[in-house]
From Swiss-Prot:
Catalyzes the reduction of the glycolytic intermediate dihydroxyacetone phosphate (DHAP) to sn-glycerol 3-phosphate (G3P), the key precursor for phospholipid synthesis. Its EC number is 1.1.1.94. Pathway: Membrane lipid metabolism; glycerophospholipid metabolism. PROSITE patterns: NAD_G3PDH (PS00957). It is found in: Cytoplasm. This is Glycerol-3-phosphate dehydrogenase [NAD(P)+]. NADPH binds at S10, F11, R31, K105, A140, R255, V279, E281. Belongs to the NAD-dependent glycerol-3-phosphate dehydrogenase family. It is an enzyme of class 1 (oxidoreductase). The active site is at K191.
Length: 333
């Protein structure tokens, strides 16, 4: 089986490593000639994982069209803000009837579209039944190190979901399928916003009580938004909901938690982002989630305060104070 992966960041590389481990021939697309050489000649991703050895069957190319042509499956893993342009470029070169798996997370800023809505808007209808979405608690480096990991595979087409589930599932990588595309996407995107808040609390020196509070109320916000958009609330108790939220809020490898942590320590957002090697999706997702919540009339207190901090320079200590002094409420969604 030949598989093309769009995006040679940490997560695209990790998914490629799993698939190559299974014996598939995998090609990553990267814009960088240097990165492609590093993967092809030295079996390492010099930019994102310079300390880890990749499988021999994992190759890289700077030719996007060649990466998707004549493949048996395509995996899409670029930052969500780059997705629309990439799909426009490849849509006439995708082989018919191949599974298309998205691993991107986020909500497009201007249109407020979910990743699935971008795919269905940019690709012809003939491909829609082949689409699926992968999300869950999965740090890339741990996947390459073959640490046992579980994720969700969501598709509106059961046959597609089960086919992708079969292709990905391996001794250390287990997948669960669900028809709830919206729920999986909302959980995967919005947990990054909550992780920024959790990082701020850690940076300010608050304890684990505070982190647990943010995770609990954050899950409440995510579920509320998901229900408004038509998701199954039970999805948010699964890998792409609670699982991903806990990992992203607590794990030191979380880019979004790191952004919040450094903000809590007094650094500016500009300083933080300019020093990072990878995209922290939660920064852009905070803006789009805030706007989507306003549009749909969904109360999202943590998201609103993270927005004030990122886009209006509100002091992190004031953010925490505002959250703790809100009107008292009954527990529940």
């Amino acid at each position: 089986m030949k598989i093309g992966i769009i995006g040679a960041g940490s997560f695209g590389t990790a998914l490629g490593s799993i698939l190559a481990d299974k014996g598939y021939d995998v090609t990553l697309w990267t814009r960088s000639e240097e990165q492609a050489r590093s993967i092809n000649e030295n079996h390492m991703n010099s930019k994102h994982m310079p300390d880890l050895v990749l499988p021999d069957r994992l190759k890289a190319s700077t030719d996007l069209i060649q990466v998707v042509k004549d493949k048996d499956m395509i995996v899409s893993a670029p930052p969500s803000h780059a997705l629309s342009g990439i799909l426009k470029e490849i849509k006439d070169h995708i082989p018919p009837k191949v599974p298309i798996v998205s691993a991107s997370k986020g909500i497009e800023n201007e249109s407020l579209r979910l990743v699935s809505e971008i795919f269905e808007s940019e690709l012809p209808g003939q491909f829609h039944s082949q689409l699926s979405y992968l999300s869950g608690p999965s740090f890339a480096k741990e996947m390459v190190k073959r640490v046992p990991t579980i994720v969700s595979i969501a598709s509106k087409n059961e046959a597609t979901a089960k086919r992708v589930q079969e292709i990905f599932s391996f001794t250390y990588f287990r997948t669960y399928w669900t028809p709830d595309v919206v729920g999986v996407e909302v959980g995967g995107a919005l947990k990054n916003v909550i992780a920024i808040a959790a990082g701020v609390a850690d940076g300010l020196g608050f304890g684990q009580n505070t982190r647990a509070a943010l995770i609990t109320r954050g899950l409440n916000e995510i579920t509320r938004m998901g229900i408004k958009m038509g998701a199954d609330p039970m999805t948010f108790l699964g890998p792409s909901g609670m699982g991903d939220l806990v990992l992203t809020c607590c794990g030191e490898a979380s880019r979004n938690r790191t952004v919040g942590f450094r903000l809590g320590k007094g650094e500016s957002l500009k300083e933080i982002l300019s020093s990072m090697n990878e995209v922290a999706e939660g920064v852009k997702t905070t803006l789009s989630t805030k706007n989507l919540a306003d549009k749909l009339g969904v109360e999202m207190a943590i998201t609103q305060e993270v927005y004030h901090m990122l886009y209006e320079d509100k002091d992190p200590k004031e953010v925490v104070r505002a959250l703790m002094s809100r009107d008292l409420k009954r527990e529940g969604v």
